[in-house]
């Protein structure tokens, strides 16, 4: 910890730097031994702002989801009840930003919803239209009362469509500044047992100290929805109920869903061990499910079964793993259970990430570390044990669906 004292931090700045400061291009960065690139960062905005909202721009938030290495961040400053100024950057898009038809804009809708157009977002694009800036001076808006209420309920989002992703390649939900943002994508694939539901949805989770606030929505559930809950458990397993989630129709409102976490629950959340589950009349155990995960560039899910082996294995064993990818770094979490014999640690460690398409066998990319359960026929992939760097060729293969876990 430390303090930044005024007498030790007084600087003269040039006119160009002053202009950059006014455009919100100045930020403070705190470096640490574990995070040499920076562990804490803060963008400078005028002190008169009554509130600051942030949107992490990602294809994960788009509806439907867009899988790419594109990223971005936007901020919205609020002055009084009506004035909003938006700024930020984005990059690494696969195709140019749409600037005429589906131009960048601010839309109304909770996470997981597609909503109506509110304001155009003016961008200054780089070469090829694959990156750009959202300049503060070009994005000043006056909110009416309804728009202001939407903002504070997490009901406004930024959407950037591209030539190849006309519905949206990058999307970010505006939410109040928080210590940590997390994301959950709802799918029947993540349910235990897996569901063939066409339902989908998204959850935005904000963590401040021990207060967890969630918001979002779900769509196209096959049955009549039952009681939504937050549970304890890794991907691929089920666990105890923690909190009742209040829903209004298909919406999850932030003001109705703020929870105080115990120290154990906080540790579990950071370890990817808390999930949202929505049972229905069609799937009483859960029609769609979402694991709460730290913000990442992309997420990949691997459902583990004997049927997926190149030579099918008839087994009741089941499991699931989720891989988070950001800037060449991956984290794998999940679980498996029901093996019909003991886990074979002597098989070069027993669990690995391989490089090959479905139906074929490939080379080992990375050993996965397993914490075995009682009896050695079940186990978990803990986040702290399965964090590793990826070579560029392996990243390309991953995004091409060319990797599997065995």
Regions found by a protein language model. Give the residues of each.
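Metal-centered catalytic cores of metalloenzymes
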Residues: 1-228, 232-351, 355-406
């Amino acid at each position: 910890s430390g303090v930044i004292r005024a007498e030790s931090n007084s600087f003269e700045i040039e006119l160009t730097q002053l202009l950059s400061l006014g455009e919100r291009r100045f930020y403070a960065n705190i470096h640490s031994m574990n995070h040499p690139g920076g562990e804490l960062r803060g963008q400078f905005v005028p002190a008169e702002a009554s509130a600051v909202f942030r949107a992490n721009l990602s294809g994960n938030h788009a509806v439907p989801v867009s899988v790419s290495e594109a990223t971005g961040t936007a901020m919205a400053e609020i002055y009084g009840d009506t004035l909003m100024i938006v700024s930020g950057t984005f990059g690494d898009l696969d195709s140019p930003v749409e600037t005429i038809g589906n131009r960048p804009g601010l839309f109304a809708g909770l996470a997981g919803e597609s909503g109506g157009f509110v304001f155009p977002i003016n961008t200054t694009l780089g070469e090829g239209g694959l990156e750009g800036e959202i300049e503060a001076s070009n994005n000043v808006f006056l909110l009416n009362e309804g728009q202001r209420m939407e903002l504070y309920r997490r009901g406004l989002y930024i959407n950037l469509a591209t030539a190849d992703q006309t519905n949206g390649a990058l999307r970010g939900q505006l939410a109040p500044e928080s210590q940590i943002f997390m994301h959950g994508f709802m799918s029947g694939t993540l349910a235990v047992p897996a569901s063939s539901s066409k339902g989908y949805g998204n959850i935005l989770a904000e963590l401040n100290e021990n207060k967890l606030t969630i918001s979002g929505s779900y769509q196209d559930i096959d049955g009549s929805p039952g009681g939504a809950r937050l549970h304890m458990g890794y991907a691929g397993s089920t666990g105890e109920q923690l909190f009742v989630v209040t829903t209004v129709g298909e919406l999850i409102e932030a003001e109705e869903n703020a929870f105080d976490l115990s120290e154990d629950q906080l540790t579990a959340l950071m370890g990817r061990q808390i999930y949202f589950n929505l049972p229905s009349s069609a799937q009483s155990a859960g029609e769609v499910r979402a694991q709460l995960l730290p913000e990442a560039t992309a997420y990949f899910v691997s459902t583990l079964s004997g049927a997926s082996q190149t030579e099918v294995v008839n087994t009741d064993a089941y499991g699931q793993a989720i891989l988070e990818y950001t800037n060449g770094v991956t984290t794998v979490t999940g679980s498996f259970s029901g093996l019909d014999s003991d886990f074979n640690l002597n098989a070069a460690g027993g669990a690995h990430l391989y490089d090959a398409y479905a139906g074929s066998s490939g080379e080992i990319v990375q050993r996965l570390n397993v914490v075995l359960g009682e009896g050695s026929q079940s186990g978990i992939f803990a986040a702290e044990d399965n964090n590793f760097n990826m070579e560029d060729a392996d990243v390309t293969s991953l995004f091409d669906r060319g990797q599997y876990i065995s």
